[in-house]
């Protein structure tokens, strides 16, 4: 297929980008900075989807500029008839210009964020593009979207491709420091979704040198294996379904584990559709029909089995759904949800027919999966009965807050916060030291439940979790409603030792599995009590890590250091109410960590590794991360 200037279609100019960058890249924070890289990489991926590129290299240079190099056809350099300038300059200086807007050039495009590489150019203090094409090497440079050179021929080349180097504009962005892990996560994702494309990322910044390369022949199947590699799997290999209809290409990978949570990832043209859409609705419909038919036709006894639902069949399932579609219609600027209505029926049919074939080829494994679904249905019924039992209690009983909760006076959830505190003694100090208007205290006691190894019916009736569920007031699991949340800050306060770390992890696992919106909406925090109290010249100083402590000690004259009194806190109970308030609870001076999910796949893997049944992955994880541990209780 030819790719020349006439394939470049212009929609409108570039004037507004620098004035309102947030409209085009979401924000001028580090997320917007990363968005620039994704835009350039998306152009290379479009070439790969069209069958002309199989290698993409990303380099973070020592000066915080970024280079993206591919072996595609190279951006055309001939003159565009309507515009009277080279196609290369057109693509880099006009908003919404590019081959992806012309159906004849790319049937499927992933880089259609409503922006394109011209926005990267507009928001860069410097950009250079080198094109290898037609036996020649072309180069043009820009500053803040304005050409600073002509399209010059700088040599000959037997290769082909496009190399873009840009330095984001410090006048626009809050930071120019890229996060290697965030970029590599997205590039790994792209390599899974587009098998047999080799994508590498290199960090050349001083002290941060790193290199990663991603190449997966298995594509979606390899993606599913990657997500589930620390889980106890029911299948040896992921099931794979693919098909196409009316230019819609559907690929689905499925694998069941022995766990209780399901994990469904969906993509349209390589874009993560976090809110789902018609393709996910089609998947669920086709999946439910096929699994219901498999159960109906199986030899498994149907006696006393509740009616099996989608959730029952999904228990322990990891699925990756990827579709390629010529003209996706996304709802919202974030591309969070696919809206093309005709896609649902196509995906439903392909998944239904493909899954039935897979089932016929794997009857023994499928019997294990169906029996798992039956156990899930029985647990669901038990959970329903437990909820009904709670509802049948008097209104006073069912709404009663736990007796150990010391609530606060404010009625406004936005200004209310709850400290979930390990131990009665620390809870007592916290109750005495708190701000009674806005701070509630809920002490924990006894052994916490590991929800990773427990079905929902056991979770919602657990005597250690019921006080937390009741205090927060928003329900749990499938009946969790964040608008009912009684506190907008949920602060986990535990000792700075191994037991405290374990309690924090158990609570975070519970929130992640049964109240994930708490984390997604920024409501969960970890309190950071000090590790040391240092007394010197009748003044007390608190330090939260060894670096702070050593820096302070280093500032004291050598001869006076014997006058320093140093205490290392092992537990919260060692502090009196005033000290606990001053160091850990006073909003003006305290330190807290906000819990965020930057990488949902990695979070899933870590919770399964740390809290699941399999010991070996947990041992490996601890060995690999032991060097990163700052305070280790032995």
From Swiss-Prot:
It is found in: Cytoplasm. The keyword Isomerase applies. Its EC number is 5.6.2.2. Mg(2+) 2 binds at residues 495, 497. Binds two Mg(2+) per subunit. The magnesium ions form salt bridges with both the protein and the DNA. Can also accept other divalent metal cations, such as Mn(2+) or Ca(2+). Keywords: ATP-binding, Cytoplasm, DNA-binding, Isomerase, Magnesium, Metal-binding, Nucleotide-binding, Topoisomerase. GO terms for biological process: DNA topological change; DNA-templated DNA replication. Mg(2+) 1 binds at residues 422, 495. It catalyses: ATP-dependent breakage, passage and rejoining of double-stranded DNA. The record marks 447, 450 as: Interaction with DNA. It is an enzyme of class 5 (isomerase). It comes from the Bacteria. Its cofactor is Mg(2+); Mn(2+); Ca(2+). Residues 416-530 form the Toprim domain. One of its GO terms (molecular function) is metal ion binding. One of its GO terms (cellular component) is cytoplasm. It holds the Pfam family DNA_gyraseB. Belongs to the type II topoisomerase GyrB family. Heterotetramer, composed of two GyrA and two GyrB chains. In the heterotetramer, GyrA contains the active site tyrosine that forms a transient covalent intermediate with DNA, while GyrB binds cofactors and catalyzes ATP hydrolysis. A type II topoisomerase that negatively supercoils closed circular double-stranded (ds) DNA in an ATP-dependent manner to modulate DNA topology and maintain chromosomes in an underwound state. Negative supercoiling favors strand separation, and DNA replication, transcription, recombination and repair, all of which involve strand separation. Also able to catalyze the interconversion of other topological isomers of dsDNA rings, including catenanes and knotted rings. Type II topoisomerases break and join 2 DNA strands simultaneously in an ATP-dependent manner. Few gyrases are as efficient as E.coli at forming negative supercoils. Not all organisms have 2 type II topoisomerases; in organisms with a single type II topoisomerase this enzyme also has to decatenate newly replicated chromosomes. This is DNA gyrase subunit B. It comes from Borrelia hermsii.
């Amino acid at each position: 297929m030819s790719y020349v200037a006439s394939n470049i279609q212009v929609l409108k100019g570039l004037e507004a980008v620098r004035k309102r960058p947030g409209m085009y890249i979401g924000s001028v924070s580090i997320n917007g900075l990363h968005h620039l890289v994704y835009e350039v990489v998306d152009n290379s991926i479009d070439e790969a989807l069209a069958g002309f590129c199989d290698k993409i290299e990303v380099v973070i240079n020592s000066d915080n500029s970024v280079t993206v190099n591919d072996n595609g056809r190279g951006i055309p350099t001939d003159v565009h008839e309507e515009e009277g300038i080279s196609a290369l300059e057109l693509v880099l200086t006009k908003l919404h210009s590019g081959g992806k807007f012309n159906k004849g050039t790319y049937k499927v495009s992933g880089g259609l964020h409503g922006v394109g590489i011209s926005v990267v150019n507009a928001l860069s203090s410097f950009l250079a593009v080198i094109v290898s094409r037609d036996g020649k090497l072309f180069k043009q440079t820009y500053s803040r979207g304005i050409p600073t050179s002509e399209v010059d021929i700088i040599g000959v080349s037997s290769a082909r491709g496009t190399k873009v180097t840009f330095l984001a504009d410090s006048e626009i962005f809050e930071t120019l420091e890229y996060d290697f892990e965030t970029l590599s996560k997205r590039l790994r994702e792209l390599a899974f979704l587009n098998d047999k494309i080799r994508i590498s990322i290199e960090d050349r910044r001083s002290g941060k040198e790193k290199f990663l390369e991603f190449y997966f022949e298995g594509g979606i199947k390899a993606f599913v294996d990657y997500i589930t590699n620390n889980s106890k799997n029911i299948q040896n290999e992921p099931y794979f379904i693919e098909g196409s209809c009316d230019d819609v290409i559907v690929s689905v990978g499925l694998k069941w584990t022995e766990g209780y949570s399901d994990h469904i990832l969906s993509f349209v043209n390589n874009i993560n559709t976090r809110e789902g859409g018609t393709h996910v609705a089609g998947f669920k419909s086709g999946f439910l029909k096929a699994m219901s038919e498999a159960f109906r036709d199986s030899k498994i006894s149907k006696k006393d089995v509740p009616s099996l639902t989608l959730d029952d069949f999904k228990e322990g399932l990891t699925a990756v759904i990827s579709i390629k579609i010529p003209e996706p219609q996304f709802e919202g600027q974030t591309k969070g949800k696919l809206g093309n209505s005709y896609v649902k029926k196509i995906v439903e049919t392909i998944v239904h027919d493909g899954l039935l074939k897979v089932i016929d080829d794997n009857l023994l494994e499928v019997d294990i999966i169906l029996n798992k679904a039956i156990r899930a249905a029985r647990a669901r019924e038990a959970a329903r009965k437990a909820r009904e039992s709670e509802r049948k209690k008097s209104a006073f009983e069912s709404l009663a807050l736990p007796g150990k909760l010391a609530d606060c006076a404010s009625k406004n959830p936005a200004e209310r916060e709850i400290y979930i505190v390990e131990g009665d003694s620390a809870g007592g100090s916290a109750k005495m030291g708190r701000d009674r208007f806005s701070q509630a205290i809920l002490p924990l006691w006894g052994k916490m439940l590991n929800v990773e190894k427990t079905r929902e019916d056991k979770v919602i009736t657990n005597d250690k979790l019921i006080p937390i569920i009741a205090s927060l007031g928003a329900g749990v699991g499938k009946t969790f409603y964040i608008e009912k949340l009684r506190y907008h800050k949920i602060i986990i306060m535990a000792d700075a030792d191994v037991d405290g770390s374990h309690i924090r992890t158990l609570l975070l696992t519970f929130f992640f599995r049964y109240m994930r919106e708490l984390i997604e909406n920024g409501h969960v925090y970890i309190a950071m009590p000090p590790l040391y109290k240092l007394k010197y010249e009748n003044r007390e100083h608190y330090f939260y890590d060894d670096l702070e402590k050593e820096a302070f000690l280093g500032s004291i004259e050598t001869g006076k250091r014997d006058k320093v009194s140093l205490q290392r806190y092992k537990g919260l109970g060692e502090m009196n109410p005033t000290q606990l308030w001053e160091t850990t609870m006073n909003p003006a001076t305290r330190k807290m960590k906000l819990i965020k999910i930057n990488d949902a796949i990695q979070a899933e893997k870590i919770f399964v590794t740390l809290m699941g049944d399999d010991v070996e992955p947990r041992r490996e994880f601890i060995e690999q991360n032991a060097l990163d541990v700052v305070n280790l209780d032995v």
